[in-house]
A protein has these predicted regions:
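Long, charge-rich low-complexity segments
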Residues: 191-219
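Short glycine-/small-residue-rich flexible loop motifs, especially phosphate/cofactor-binding loops
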Residues: 19, 181-182
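C-terminal active-site-capping segments
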Residues: 187
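Charged, glycine-enriched surface loops/patches
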Residues: 179-180, 219
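Amphipathic C-terminal alpha-helical segment
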Residues: 104-110, 158-167, 190
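GST superfamily/GST-like fold recognition
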Residues: 141-178, 184
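GST-like domain detector, emphasizing the conserved glutathione-binding G-site
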Residues: 1-141, 209-213, 217-218
Length: 219
């Protein structure tokens, strides 16, 4: 079997989820970067939704980061999922919640007007408070052991931290979420999952847009 090929966009958080998993599993892989604003035909031919990540394993194409990560986990032991089926399903459910949080956060920093910005900010606060209630003593979602659900949240926390350092939103008091975020950002696979100039690329991506959200972070 040849090295798996991960088809990527440089600042995509869903790609980053899979890169973190590949690094945690110590799987050798290759990366092919595309421009999602002008995707090549060969990519559209293999990606049903026209989205990244896509993982090519020999002649088989996988898409959707959660599916890719579960495949990688199954074929590269030891597992990064709980043994108990109910706990494993619980992790999957909160991975989906993390996806919605990413979309909420994206909607915040791309908001066209102040009202939308404030609505997204309120949604983000409420959802972080909800997430707080799911966390135990840490340092990770399942306690001492890093899991796929942690890989799913790390890209969100990295982006939130970058923007909080640039201009704080005054997020709600969520000490467990904060501690979890700090533990994930300190894990070697997380900074290694993006380029050295990721912060600049991410901020350039935001501030190149028009609207209240980009203006907030240009200030």
């Amino acid at each position: 079997m040849s090295k798996p090929e991960l088809i990527s966009f440089a600042i995509c958080p869903f790609v980053q989820r899979s890169v973190i998993t590949l690094l945690e599993k110590d799987v050798a892989f290759t990366s092919t970067y595309i421009d999602l604003a002008d995707p090549p035909k060969w990519f559209l031919d293999i990606s049903p939704f026209g989205k990244v990540p896509v993982l090519k394993v020999d002649d088989t194409v996988l898409f959707e980061s959660a599916v890719i990560n579960e495949y990688l986990d199954e074929v590269n032991p030891p597992s990064l999922q709980p043994v108990d089926p109910l706990r494993r399903a619980h992790n999957r459910a909160w991975t989906v919640f993390g996806q919605e949080l990413l979309f909420t956060h994206y909607g915040l920093y791309t908001a066209a007007d102040e009202a939308t910005f404030e609505d997204r900010q309120a949604d983000l606060h409420a959802n972080l408070a909800r997430l707080e209630g799911q966390l135990g003593q840490g340092p990770y979602f399942n306690g001492e052991h890093f899991s796929l659900v942690d890989a799913a949240y790390a890209p969100l926390f990295q982006r939130m931290t970058i923007l909080e350092q640039r201009r704080p939103l005054g997020l709600v008091d969520t000490p467990k979420v904060t501690a979890w975020s700090e533990a994930l950002l300190a894990r070697p696979s997380v900074p290694a999952s993006v380029s050295e100039d990721f912060t600049e690329q991410f901020l350039d991506y935001i501030t190149a847009k028009e609207g209240y959200g980009p203006d907030w972070y240009r200030a």
